Amino acid sequence: MSNPEKIFYPFIKSHNKDNWAGYVSPRMGFFNMDIPDVSFGTGFLVGNRYGVMDLPHVHDGAYNFFIFTGADLDNIFDAPFEAEFFLGENGQELEQYNINKPTFVIAPPGVYHSPIYFKKVYKGFNSMIQYSGHESRRIYSDVDENGEEVERVAKSNVTPCIKDPSKLCTFCGLCFTDANETEQDAIDKMAPIHAKVVNTEKFKKYVYELKKDYHNLGDAIMNPRLSFKGREELDEAEYQFSFNIITKPCKLGDDEPVSNGQVAEFLWFSGTDVTDSWGTFDAEIEVMVGDDPDNMKPVTFSEPGVIAIPPGMWRGPITVKRADKPICFMPWYPHTKPRYKITRKMVDGKPVLVYDDETTITNPTAGDELFMQIKR
């Protein structure tokens, strides 16, 4: 079987936000480096007080996806917070969106976005930011001495440091966060942004309040859960995900191994308090994986992390052996490819692959049609 150490990835305690006043550190995150051609990386970037994150900027060749929630994921629909987010055709005309419920936001290539204004933070404000594309630089909007808009390019380890121009920028946070900042300081900092607000609602479709999903997965998972089904709910959304809060030992999925075919799968396990993601995780979990249904082996872990299933790998049940504290389990599918759920059946004494859901196949190949005929 493939190396289990390349299947489970414990979250690394990232200290790159230690200097960012108003943010929880260490930060929990995962960035795929081992599954080719799958752009996926995210983490909990958690604000623990009022503040302003970033300035209006754009990525010409990339999408940004944002998920906003409160601090307590086991109370995800009622965890309180108030934030403002901005989208615009340029950096000088911005639409303002007030967010106080779990929300998914898309910033397509070429669309200016930010700042995120942490307006009211009662315990913590969680922003999960995903980046999908081939352009890592940021382009900021400035105004020159003649009042004309000009664009300024910034990129980590390329742009000079504002505090010390002899060094390169590392986005350490020292130039745009201040431990002594007051709530009024944050309000004053937002005044120039609010002066740019227009009421065009051109980008309203990219701000989507996440819905309650009532499931039949059993009483071990809180009901309702939060889920997002990709383009079925929001055009241009590349991601599918759900927040499943597990409260007791259980088994998820069938004993029979399945494969998602050409689709990678990321299974995220963490604590439910984003201000203490490690301290609120106390569980033991086993996931069966293998290169084929005859060679399945367990991957067992007792710390927060991600199970990364490459395309073509088989997965069996997810068994929560111990859950002394609630667990946040998030399956992620970071692309728009159809998920062909494949199982193996014995037909006339021979093993064949069978699609369990033919409706996902809109343009069947000859091989697809063969498998569907076998199933029928």
Language-model segments: what does each one mean?
Residues 1-57, 150-257, 360-376:
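A short, N-terminal "cap"/entry segment at the start of jelly-roll beta-barrel domains
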Residues 149, 345, 351-355:
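Short linear proline/tyrosine/threonine-rich motifs used for host-factor recruitment
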Residues 91-92, 96-119, 291-321:
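Conserved metal-binding segment of the jelly-roll/cupin
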Residues 68-100, 138-140, 269-302, 340-343:
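A short beta-strand-loop-beta hairpin characteristic of the jelly-roll/cupin
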